[in-house]
Amino acid sequence: MKKILLIASMTAGLTACASSPAPEEDSRLKEAYSACINTAQGSPEKIEACQSVLNVLKKERRHQQFANEESVRVLDYQQCIQATRTGNDQAVKADCDKVWQEIRSHNNVQ
């Protein structure tokens, strides 16, 4: 009986050790994305580079929803910037600023 309890406790301990690096890595990816967004300062080229981190996050099941939502926001922002280059700068700039603030607010490093 003691052997069974010992084996069960060792298995539980090893399982806990084996699964702890994954959440740590996940949080590092989200932190990397947040840092990328925070340093992008609205630059479409820099934001495009952040997309590669989102692509990795999309592969992680627990981050798929976040990554998909952020991808939409980033694409919205890039389209918005493109619209300012081709159309009425002033009218579109306010919309771009709103989208950018939304991206920033979702990516504040806590």
From Swiss-Prot:
Keywords: Cell membrane, Lipoprotein, Membrane, Palmitate, Signal. Induction: In the absence of chitobiose, expression of chiPQ is silenced by the ChiX small regulatory RNA (sRNA), which sequesters the ribosome binding site of the chiPQ mRNA by an antisense mechanism. In the presence of chitosugars, the chbBCARFG chitobiose operon is induced and acts as an RNA trap to degrade the constitutively expressed ChiX, leading to the translation of chiPQ. Chitobiose and chitotriose also induce chiP mRNA synthesis. ChiQ appears dispensable for growth on either chitobiose or chitotriose. A lipid is attached at C17 (S-diacylglycerol cysteine). GO terms for cellular component: plasma membrane. Residues 1-16 form the signal peptide. It is found in: Cell membrane. It is a lipid-anchor. InterPro entries: YbfN-like. This is Uncharacterized lipoprotein ChiQ. A lipid is attached at C17 (N-palmitoyl cysteine).
